[in-house]
Amino acid sequence: MSQGHGKYDFYIGLGLAMSSSIFIGGSFILKKKGLLRLARKGSTRAGQGGHAYLKEWLWWAGLLSMGAGEVANFAAYAFAPATLVTPLGALSVLVSAILSSYFLNERLNLHGKIGCLLSILGSTVMVIHAPKEEEIETLNEMSHKLGDPGFVVFATLVVIVSLILIFVVGPRHGQTNILVYITICSVIGAVSVSCAKGLGIAIKELFAGKPVLQHPLTWILLLSLIVCVSTQINYLNRALDIFNTSIVTPIYYVFFTTSVITCSAILFKEWQDMPVDDVIGTLSGFFTIIVGIFLLHAFKDVSFSLSSLPVSFRKDEKAVNGSLSSMYEVLNNNEESLTCGIEQHTAENISRRNGNLTAF
């Protein structure tokens, strides 16, 4: 792959990844509104295993929006490294957070806005330092990578962990612990990204006139992708139905991105030939995104905005002045009471003495 062609593919993948984030961020809002409408109608909720959302057009609109985003995301993996494409999902967090504040009445405070800004800055840093060229260009190379012992161990662990979460942990703690369903989506999502990457390579070879449809790996990747995406949709719906959208979206991003970067490092070894400064820059960008996501999530219930900064200061100042005034009044009252008591006591003693003298 020539350097010019590699950069051209890089920017195509970048544009597709950004458009994907916009579609996916909007899909969370549409699907959540559909689920809320069903809840008001008294239908069995998705978090309780219900599937009434299949009759709700808003949910289908959200699904189509997510589908468009996933198609763009799928295409992006064919042109750019997973280390670049996946972290740009932070834009979907930004889109979802802003739209949820307008359409779902989920407030976005100052901490959330700073978190969104940090997510964008972190994504920018990752784009700058991400690897610009792909090293896998054929299905045969992909097949060789999938047979690597490191990836086989990773895939086996993903399957085991997913089965335990789905059949053991999920029924017990899925309704109360947000991490259960999101972890299922994330670890399975790492495998789906690998499948999407392989299918993207297959499609590029198909347009080049190669007989990829006769390659067994093409159909294995397609079947695996369908199973993984179906599972992701199911458990993501449950998480969205039970928990706040502004919580689900950022946590899902962090878990999903971490899983994909780990899978990409094991399978594609994209980090192997990266300079040290690019590795440090990529990790710094990713941790910056995590800090932004934390601010967006941890302080979501705090009613705090930029305009409230001087107001709160004035309130504190008034409170201090008020407490000092109250203390001063109490001291004055006590002093007056003490003075009155002494005077009254003195008067009584004088009157008693006068009475005694009169008796004599």
Swiss-Prot record:
The chain crosses the membrane at residues 10-30, 57-77, 79-99, 108-128, 150-170, 176-196, 216-236, 247-267, 279-299. Keywords: Cell membrane, Endosome, Ion transport, Magnesium, Membrane, Transmembrane, Transmembrane helix, Transport. It is found in: Cell membrane; Early endosome. One of its GO terms (cellular component) is plasma membrane. GO terms for biological process: magnesium ion transport. It catalyses: Mg(2+)(in) = Mg(2+)(out). Its main location: membrane. Residues 31-56, 100-107, 171-175, 237-246, 300-360 are cytoplasmic. It is a multi-pass membrane protein. The keyword Metal-binding does not apply. InterPro entries: Mg_trans_NIPA. It comes from the Eukaryota. The keyword Isomerase does not apply. Residues 1-9, 78, 129-149, 197-215, 268-278 are extracellular. One of its GO terms (molecular function) is magnesium ion transmembrane transporter activity. Acts as a selective Mg(2+) transporter. Belongs to the NIPA family. This is Magnesium transporter NIPA2. It comes from Bos taurus (Bovine). The gene is NIPA2.
